[in-house]
């Protein structure tokens, strides 16, 4: 089957679509063509003409900049073929929901909305499932950055990191930053982490950043800042224990941003799917960190497998 992947070059969007296509490849042979929507090329320049078109196709992508391109492409291709063309939006578009054959979206996007019949829901974010055994002596810390969902307090985060490392002296830790991690925090991490012989800070721009997925899959302890839903659900899609790191003061009052990400993180905490590195405010204004462990009874999330199965079921029913 032909796949035309419309891309907006945002890492979180690309990783989720990639995880889904990798899973679909296990079910059906795919020929994938990527289309960079930021290049503003005309559809005839990037899509096959009537002499090149062969077989059914999937038009897929994530992000508001690509959804209109997917619908335009389907209309354009319909002029050249009677073959099936399936338009699939990954994440919830803000318009023309009924124009897509399928919408693959997180549950929190439809908690207070009517659920259209063409929507396939999943929990959190799409990530490849790993059943690799973990190394009980290894840990990973994944750091995001400022977002509209959380007040990213760098001082609190550094205190939390020192606490995590102090109570796990026998684990070998790798700390990874992200594109949103502030430069000042990167500098602090580099300078202060050098004091720990069992810790390595890996900057996003270094060649070793490619080891992130392998480290995530094989680490028994995974500590993640809650500002990045994608990072959290990537961790939960592998074996081991996942912990959210509190990054804002307990007295902080949130006055901006969408509630849905915070509600999603709170649900993970309440169901014990994740542990928490929290801050307790003692009398006298002393902040004390505390680690609460997650339940050990959960298997890795397999949301991408469920979504892939539903997509294949839909496509097969159209034949």
Place the predicted regions along the sequence by residue.
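Short, aromatic/basic amphipathic alpha-helical patches
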Residues: 18-24, 72-76, 102, 112, ...
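Conserved donor-binding/catalytic loop of nucleotide-activated donor transferases
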Residues: 217-219, 237-241
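A nucleotide-sugar donor-handling region in carbohydrate enzymes
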Residues: 97-155
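Conserved catalytic-core segment of nucleotide-activated headgroup transferases in glycan assembly
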Residues: 146-179
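Active-site and donor-binding regions of nucleotide-sugar-utilizing enzymes
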Residues: 5-122
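Short glycine/proline-centered loop/turn elements that form peptide/ligand docking sites
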Residues: 209-211, 230-231, 242-244, 248-257, ...
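Leloir-type glycosyltransferase catalytic cores
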Residues: 262-319
């Amino acid at each position: 089957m032909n796949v035309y992947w419309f891309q907006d070059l945002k890492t979180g969007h690309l990783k989720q679509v990639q995880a889904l296509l990798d899973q679909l490849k296990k079910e059906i042979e795919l020929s994938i063509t990527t289309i960079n929507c930021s290049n503003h090329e005309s559809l005839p320049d990037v899509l096959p003409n009537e002499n090149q078109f062969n077989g059914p196709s999937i038009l897929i992508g994530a992000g508001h900049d690509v959804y209109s391109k997917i619908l335009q492409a389907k209309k354009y291709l319909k002029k050249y073929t009677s073959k099936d063309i399936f338009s699939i939006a990954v994440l919830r578009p803000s318009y023309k929901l009924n124009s897509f054959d399928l919408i693959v979206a997180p549950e929190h996007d439809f908690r207070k909305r009517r659920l259209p019949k063409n929507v396939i829901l999943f929990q959190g974010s799409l990530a490849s499932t790993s059943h690799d055994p973990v190394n009980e002596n290894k840990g990973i810390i994944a750091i995001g950055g400022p977002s509209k969902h959380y007040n990213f307090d760098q001082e609190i985060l550094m205190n939390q990191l020192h606490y995590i490392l102090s109570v796990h002296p026998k684990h070998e830790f790798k700390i990874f930053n992200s594109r949103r991690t502030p430069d000042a925090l990167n500098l602090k991490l580099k300078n202060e982490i050098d004091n720990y012989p069992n810790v390595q800070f890996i900057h996003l721009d270094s060649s070793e950043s490619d080891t992130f997925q392998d480290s995530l899959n094989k680490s028994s302890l995974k500590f993640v800042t809650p500002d990045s839903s994608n990072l959290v659900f990537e961790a939960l899609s592998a074996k081991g224990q996942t912990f959210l790191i509190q990054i804002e003061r307990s007295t902080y009052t949130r006055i901006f941003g969408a509630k849905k990400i915070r509600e999603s993180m709170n649900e993970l905490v309440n169901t014990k799917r994740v542990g928490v590195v929290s801050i307790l405010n003692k009398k006298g204004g002393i902040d004390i960190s505390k680690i609460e462990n997650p339940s050990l009874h959960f298997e890795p999330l397999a949301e991408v497998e469920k979504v892939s199965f539903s997509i294949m079921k839909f496509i097969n029913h159209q034949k």
